[in-house]
Amino acid sequence: MIRELAGAKVFVCPEEGPSLADYANLTGLIGDLYGAGGVRLMAIPLARLGPDFLRLSSGVAGEVLQKLVNYRFQVAVLGDVSAAAAKSGPLRDFIRESNRGSSVWFMDDLAALEAKLAAAYGKA
């Protein structure tokens, strides 16, 4: 579903659905969004990215995020990553560095994403 958050058009992936860690599913979604006009930010629930997404050595996070960024999408991964980050220094560093940039963000929920967008774009 496409929503406007702090003036930005955001595609909010439903919680339920096929894994976006699957190449065909992710590519299909990218194709669909190219026809949606003006959507440049995807909010993806962590559950849709598969169990290996937060295990950096699996390569899933890199593959998924790089594909989306290559297609010029900003990505917000929605969900609690604190337990996984507490167990992995590299993951914690990756999340921290991602959140400092503008391409990939890890947010607890849509409200946190909206607050980040409002701060970034000066909209309340």
Model-derived regions, located:
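Amphipathic, Lys/Arg-enriched alpha-helical "gate/interface" segment within cytosolic domains
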Residues: 2-124
